[in-house]
């Protein structure tokens, strides 16, 4: 997903960059492997991996809830799923999301966490999905949605880069860890 800053995104120079991409490049260099950044549509990640178009998924990839679906590395980063709202909104906790429109990236960890919280989502006026978080932030800026559910790492970066008047709610939706996911059973590449 090339729209997941600061983990992976297209920089001002038009090149792919980000924490995970730089980490992957360094690991490949140290292991003597070829590094190639391959942008994919996030909701097609399983098909891309199964077809062999990509060798691994390494871009803010949440292990939690997917432990049996991939062959994983050890976790390398802790993360949370949170809600982002406008600073001037009356939303200060998850309870305040009742009757509000919430947006989330399709096939994301935040969407999975929301599916695990039906008692919360039942209170929303509407739960919308979008292809990427850049669109979600534009929707929040324009008042089309009241909140975004997303990774805290990405939320903090987006708020800082946009110099936006947003806040992250204190009560998180879920706790999780990032890892590198390989096709189920591909221990050979993982163990290099």
Show the residue positions of the predicted features.
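Periplasmic-binding protein-like
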Residues: 77-85, 152-191
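Beta->alpha turn/N-cap motifs
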Residues: 1-4, 38-43, 52-64, 87, ...
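Ligand-binding cleft/hinge of the Venus flytrap
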Residues: 8-13, 24-33, 110-131, 159-163
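Extended ligand-binding regions for polar small-molecule ligands
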Residues: 21-30, 88-91, 95-101, 106-109, ...
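A ligand-binding cleft/hinge motif common to bilobed small-molecule-binding domains
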Residues: 43-47, 60-69, 113-118, 139-175
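Short glycine-rich His-centered loop
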Residues: 1-18
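Acidic, polar ligand-binding/catalytic clefts
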Residues: 21, 25, 29, 34-96, ...
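Short acidic, glycine/proline-rich loop/turn micro-motifs
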Residues: 8-12, 95-96, 139
């Amino acid at each position: 997903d090339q729209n997941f800053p600061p983990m992976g995104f297209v920089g001002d120079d038009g090149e792919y960059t980000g924490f995970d991409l730089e980490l992957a490049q360094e690991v490949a260099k140290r292991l003597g492997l070829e590094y190639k950044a391959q942008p994919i549509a996030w909701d097609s990640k399983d098909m891309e991996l199964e077809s062999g178009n990509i060798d691994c998924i390494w871009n803010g990839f949440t292990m939690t809830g997917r432990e049996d679906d991939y062959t994983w590395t050890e976790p390398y980063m802790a993360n949370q799923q949170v809600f982002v709202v406008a600073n001037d909104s009356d939303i200060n906790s998850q309870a305040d999301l009742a009757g509000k429109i919430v947006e989330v990236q399709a096939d994301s960890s935040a969407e999975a966490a929301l599916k695990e919280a039906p008692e919360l989502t039942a209170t929303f006026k509407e739960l919308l999905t979008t292809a990427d978080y850049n669109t979600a932030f534009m929707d929040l800026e324009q008042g089309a949605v009241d909140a975004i559910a997303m990774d805290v790492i990405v939320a903090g970066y987006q708020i800082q880069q946009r110099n936006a008047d947003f806040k992250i709610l204190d009560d998180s939706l879920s706790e999780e860890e990032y890892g590198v996911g390989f096709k189920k059973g591909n221990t050979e590449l993982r163990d290099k």
